[in-house]
Amino acid sequence: MRWQCGTRFRGLRPAVAPWTALLALGLPGWVLAVSATAAAVVPEQHASVAGQHPLDWLLTDRGPFHRAQEYADFMERYRQGFTTRYRIYREFARWKVNNLALERKDFFSLPLPLAPEFIRNIRLLGRRPNLQQVTENLIKKYGTHFLLSATLGGEESLTIFVDKQKLGRKTETTGGASIIGGSGNSTAVSLETLHQLAASYFIDRESTLRRLHHIQIATGAIKVTETRTGPLGCSNYDNLDSVSSVLVQSPENKVQLLGLQVLLPEYLRERFVAAALSYITCSSEGELVCKENDCWCKCSPTFPECNCPDADIQAMEDSLLQIQDSWATHNRQFEESEEFQALLKRLPDDRFLNSTAISQFWAMDTSLQHRYQQLGAGLKVLFKKTHRILRRLFNLCKRCHRQPRFRLPKERSLSYWWNRIQSLLYCGESTFPGTFLEQSHSCTCPYDQSSCQGPIPCALGEGPACAHCAPDNSTRCGSCNPGYVLAQGLCRPEVAESLENFLGLETDLQDLELKYLLQKQDSRIEVHSIFISNDMRLGSWFDPSWRKRMLLTLKSNKYKPGLVHVMLALSLQICLTKNSTLEPVMAIYVNPFGGSHSESWFMPVNEGSFPDWERTNVDAAAQCQNWTITLGNRWKTFFETVHVYLRSRIKSLDDSSNETIYYEPLEMTDPSKNLGYMKINTLQVFGYSLPFDPDAIRDLILQLDYPYTQGSQDSALLQLIELRDRVNQLSPPGKVRLDLFSCLLRHRLKLANNEVGRIQSSLRAFNSKLPNPVEYETGKLCS
């Protein structure tokens, strides 16, 4: 007699000592008759849902029915990926069968009618048999349980195993016939179609089976099994073992079994339970041992690997491999999806797309986002299933010599898909696309492909990157960003053209040369200028007390407007009468490019690191001295007019401290009390003159509004910025540079204030776009 995995029994507790319960037994049975019919359709979902694992006990534990044919069929289908079962069946008249012998014993206290051979085998065991003897003499002959009650009858059923992932795909039918009804060459099989076919099974069995087998062959999404078991007519059977199955399972009436140990003497019961559990759990290959909530088989020398169910382990490893294939299939289907392919077609091909650019297109595609979420949900289900199988697999293998090895599948990140898009765009010139490397802008091709790299457009960006790719060849750079110029296909920093046509600035003297020439007061470095003063004349003695301050002016550009001048030193030859106590004091103001006297800056003599006056005697009498202030290359500056304010002070010797003190002279009303006279023989400026073309600079400024050619405006701006910086470099010392360039535009080019402001704004805006822009604050000098 055979029974199915859904039967319940009594008399069995968890497999821990003391042994009080067993699992499965069949005995020769009874005669029965069947009639009447009943039909039902039962869908069963075998895929585990969240938080429920209805099949874990079947897959992990070797329960009492693991050898039942229905359980074996279920396991085979489950491992093949069929997650849902639809079953339509009908049963024939159920007959309730009870064990009258056991009832007579309980009611009438009569001895059980045990077979003489069974009694003889019990006696042969003796008082203390080992587990092997119990197994050989009792369990292998009579089983572990006997039947208390059951419902007998016949049954015929149709079972459809369904793989829902494959079911919805369109399937091309063969021979031009439709799967359902022959209405076309292509159809999609739905669950509703299967429901209709299953419902028509008992009405038109042959036609239904033919259509179902057609779907099974065409799609591979279903597996059809037809079973007809038990006595299907009103026939009598002398031996129920000749029938494949006559036990009918129903929710209201299950098969009831009782452990065989209740028929045995007290001294054999515990030993029988231990032997039965070892026989069932360890398949007679060892002895079941339970300790600290854990049970295992103590293997016999003949079967050292009894704790390793090879078939189950192999089945789980096969399931893991199938999950790996399903994982790869999910990713491949996502890559082949309409949403993913639509994004590829929508991407621009006139410029290179880095990962950041692709991520922006990805984020704006809502349909692709939804499809990507579907991919993540499907992979999450597979990941949970993988974890469940791995837990069961490691539980089964924890006492095996060989431990399983498996690499968990990993979900592909967004950065992987962005790189995959780059690979499809730029490395798809072969059958199988390669892998794009963004850092090197190259492709790694498959080993069997000599070349897979296609044309890679130029990269756009800021700074040295391209502004636009060439329209005739996107792999080449067509134009560059402001501040860069295209040279040999690359954007290189743009350098301003020479300023010699506008203002010559390349005549600097070396410090040693300059020092030597200034000491000699070489006429070659003297800047010709005109002396102007209303207070005195050169070479004439005057009374310095006549006025507190005298103005001496040197004007350089009165007749030569095509030059600008750079001052390197200023020298005065001052003579005093003998025994004079007067000391000259000079305040120097420099006007760089003309304008009013208020547009001059004060020279900070002997302040900070600025140089002081140097005095050298001209004659032995020491009546005349050369007063020289040397600016050198460090402090040189532009000048057009030099204003010298001359004052006098009285030099006296302090007897108490032996120090020289100075004080301002009082106004003398009596000429006879004169303190001495002063004479200035020479007032010279040493430096050099630079060629200056105001018309050329005006033309350069005009290009800001009316550029001659493409790029000439940028070139003009770059030259003006260079000119501005070179001019402002000669600004006098101070916390803030003076804006000498505005003075140059205002007074030498005669531009209006609004024009000067507009030019300065244009230069600042263009300079901010240049690579590594240098901005500095300037102070206003000219109005």
From Swiss-Prot:
Q: Which GO terms describe its biological process?
A: cellular response to retinoic acid; central nervous system neuron differentiation; locomotion; multicellular organism growth; negative regulation of mitotic cell cycle; positive regulation of neuron differentiation
Compartments reported by the entry: Secreted
Question: Which residues carry attached sugars according to the database record?
Answer: N185, N354, N473, N579, N626, N658
Highest rank taxon of the organism: Eukaryota
Q: Does the keyword Magnesium apply?
A: no
Position of the signal peptide: 1-33
* Disulfide bonding pattern of the chain: none
The keyword Disulfide bond is annotated on this UniProt entry: no
What residues does the MACPF domain cover?
A: 85-281
| A GO CC term assigned to this protein in UniProt | neuronal cell body
Arranged from A to Z, the UniProt key words for this protein are: Cell cycle, Glycoprotein, Growth arrest, Secreted, Signal
Principal subcellular localisation of the protein: secreted
Which Pfam families does the entry link to? BRINP, EGF_BRNP1-3, MACPF
As for family, the record states: Belongs to the BRINP family.
Its biological purpose is as follows: Inhibits neuronal cell proliferation by negative regulation of the cell cycle transition.
Name listed for the protein in its UniProt record = BMP/retinoic acid-inducible neural-specific protein 2
Please report the organism this UniProt entry assigns to the protein.
Answer: Homo sapiens (Human)
